[in-house]
């Protein structure tokens, strides 16, 4: 493989990738509103000579290159979060701007930059005849990730393919182009969205003893939730902290993976109440909990932890603990209902699909993370090349739910995600496009031994019909 030719080709497309990314940034594309950016991506793929470009029923845009039966997929979510307070932005977040080195605007790092690199990385494969015999590339611009990570791939697996077994038999592995700060990422923590409902009885506020104040009871739950996140796991603690999963005593099978991924966390993210008036005792109170899960935790264990909090047991007859559902229509109007559960996943560093990216990076760019400038390198220097994300990605479904091998390498920085004045680096676009182009030829499926996955959370089995 001529790695210098790959680098030269990627550098030659630097201006095209930058223009393509600027065009995507200029089209507002929050979750469920991605139609405009989908059409822009479709047009770019068609211009570049993709063999087939299609839009599935959920609204994901899918480009194909090659004629083989085995699939290597590259995924980029093309929706973005909103801009938040416009006063926090130094320039128009959609009009954006560019310098010699950076591109500014919402979605640059998270993560339309990944779409630009993937689209052109596969074009380089075609230009240089790098697609191995028997393979084809599937480039996915996926929707609604910011709203419900992985739901787009649930739809792809179950509605585009004929279910998990069919998808697993056809897809060798998936590269996620989420930002990785120059690293190759082999997993991340999972998450779930938990709801706690507390029942009370209203009465006139002048005689509160006649009622049963749901807010007061929920206040005790809130303190317990804080304890669950902040406490250690000492025997003297009534509520043992989530840090316990880093200890082989509490997590004998997966404590090493948990230490790699980081401990689980929980925080109260929303609170709601009902009351007849401001002069009455509240008759209900509900909270949302953002729960991040590490290796060894399951959705059942996380729900039970909340149910077993002292305050929840104290008010057991008035408490309901549940998991949120997601059923928001996509930009096409299609609804794919699913639970707000996003499974943890990790690969072994020796897995052949991970090793293909490592080998490509070593051949193209060396053994260390690279970046265009001091700001980029501030989050890269000294970190291992192979690592993990802090946030969540579509990998929660690709590998977490369905066991399709997944690995990450993408332009930009995690710290830029959801932040005002978001930027990405043009050199990252080049770096990633070159690596994507090299990977298929360095993948050795004969090294698969069925043990790539270190940890993959079980499915819920919920009937959501």
Each language-model region and where it sits:
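Metal-dependent amide/peptide-bond hydrolase catalytic core
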Residues: 5, 179, 195-465
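Short glycine/proline-enriched loop/turn "hinge" motifs that connect secondary-structure elements
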Residues: 88, 130-131, 185-191, 278-282, ...
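Phosphate-handling active-site elements
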Residues: 99-101, 121-138, 163-168, 225-236, ...
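Acidic/His- and Gly-rich active-site-bordering loop/insert found
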Residues: 2-104, 127-134, 413
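Short, flexible, mixed-charge acidic loops at enzyme active sites
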Residues: 84-97, 189-193, 332-337
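Short glycine-aspartate micro-motif
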Residues: 71-73, 103, 170-176, 193-195, ...
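Buried hydrophobic packing segments
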Residues: 41, 115-125, 153-156, 218-221, ...
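Acidic/histidine-rich catalytic neighborhood of metal-dependent amide-processing enzymes
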Residues: 111-193, 258
């Amino acid at each position: 493989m001529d790695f210098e030719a790959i680098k030269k080709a990627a550098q030659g497309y630097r201006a095209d990738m930058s223009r393509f990314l600027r065009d995507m940034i200029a089209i507002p594309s929050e979750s469920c509103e991605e139609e405009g950016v989908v059409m822009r991506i479709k047009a770019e793929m068609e211009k570049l000579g993709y063999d087939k470009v299609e839009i599935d029923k959920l609204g994901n845009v899918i480009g194909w290159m090659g004629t083989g039966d085995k699939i290597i997929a590259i995924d980029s979510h093309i929706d973005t979060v909103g801009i938040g307070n416009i006063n926090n932005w130094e320039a128009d977040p959609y009009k954006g701007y560019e310098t010699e080195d950076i591109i500014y605007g919402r979605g640059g790092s998270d993560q339309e930059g990944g779409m630009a690199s993937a689209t052109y990385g596969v074009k380089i494969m075609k230009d240089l005849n790098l697609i191995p015999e028997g393979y084809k590339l599937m480039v996915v611009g996926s929707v609604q990730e910011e709203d419900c990570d992985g739901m787009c791939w649930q739809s792809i697996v179950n509605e585009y393919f004929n279910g998990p077994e069919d998808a697993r038999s056809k897809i060798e592995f998936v590269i996620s182009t989420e930002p990785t700060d120059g690293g190759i990422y082999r997993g991340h923590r999972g998450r779930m969205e938990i709801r706690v409902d507390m029942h009370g009885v209203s009465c006139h506020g002048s005689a509160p003893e006649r009622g049963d104040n749901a807010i007061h009871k929920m206040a005790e739950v809130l303190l317990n939730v804080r304890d669950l996140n902040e406490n250690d796991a000492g025997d003297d603690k009534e509520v043992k902290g989530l840090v316990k999963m880093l200890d082989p005593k509490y997590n004998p099978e997966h404590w090493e993976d948990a230490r790699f991924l980081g401990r689980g966390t929980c925080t109260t993210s929303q609170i709601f109440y009902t009351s007849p008036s401001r002069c009455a005792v509240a008759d209900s109170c509900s909270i949302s909990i953002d729960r991040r899960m590490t290796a060894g935790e399951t959705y059942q264990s996380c729900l039970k932890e909340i149910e077993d909090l002292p305050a929840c047991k104290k008010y057991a007859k008035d408490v309901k603990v549940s998991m949120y559902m997601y059923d928001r229509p996509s930009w096409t109007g299609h609804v794919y209902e699913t639970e707000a559960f996003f499974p943890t996943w990790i690969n072994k560093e020796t897995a052949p699909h991970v090793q293909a990216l490592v080998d490509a990076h070593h051949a193209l760019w060396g053994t260390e993370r690279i970046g265009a400038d001091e700001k980029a390198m501030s989050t890269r220097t000294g970190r291992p090349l192979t690592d993990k994300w802090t946030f969540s990605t579509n990998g929660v479904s690709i590998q977490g739910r369905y066991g399709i091998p997944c690995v990450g390498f993408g332009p930009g920085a995690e710290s830029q995600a959801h932040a005002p004045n978001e930027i990405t680096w043009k050199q990252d676009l080049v770096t990633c496009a070159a690596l994507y182009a090299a990977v298929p030829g360095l993948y050795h499926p004969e090294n698969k031994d069925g043990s790539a996955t270190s940890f993959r959370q079980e499915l819920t089995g919920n009937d959501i019909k």
